[in-house]
Amino acid sequence: MRTAARLGIFFALCLALVTANPEQNVAAFDQGKLVAPGRLVIAGRRLTCGATATLVRDFEGFAVSSTVIMLNIEAMKDLPRPVQWLIYYHECGHIRYGPSETAADCYAVRRARREGWLDEKALDDICAVFNIAGHGPLHPDPEERCNQLRQCFAKKGGITAQDGTR
């Protein structure tokens, strides 16, 4: 069932990619658009995940990933900018490293740190939002997740899928 759903999404997105205008940037209010790789701008920052496209649409939650990153910009719009960016990079982490929540979080934190916009204060803000939003069935509880984010922030070097098992 999951495979069939992913294949359906993949084929629909391929069709949309063929008809999409690759020169168009997405604004935070453009729901239902497939954004070509390298063209997504969220809260003033251009975000990329290699050759992965982003589908901006309304759905339950903030973001999911499969063959594309799906973002609910409407649900994210009131979050602090660093939280919005980290959500995107978390989903990019799933594209790159698979289903591990910890590996996706670690990838997001390290990429944000390398880009220079994630510091201790921004990390505290992100943890505060996670504590309010809860964690759902897939993510570690907020306190454990923030501890893992801090460990990834402090750790030097690259991310591997073995960094986390969740």
Task: Walk through the language-model features, giving the residues of each.
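Long, well-structured alpha-helical subdomains associated
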Residues: 117-166
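Active-site recognition of the HExxH zinc-binding catalytic motif
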Residues: 86-95, 105
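Soluble non-cytosolic domains of exported or imported proteins
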Residues: 78-83, 98-102, 140
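Bacterial N-terminal signal peptides that target proteins for export
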Residues: 1-8
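Bacterial N-terminal signal peptides
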Residues: 8-16
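Active-site scaffold of zinc-dependent metalloenzymes
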Residues: 52-81, 92-95
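Auxiliary, metal-adjacent structural segments of Zn-dependent hydrolase domains
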Residues: 21-65
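An active-site-proximal "capping" alpha-helix that borders the catalytic cofactor pocket
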Residues: 99-115
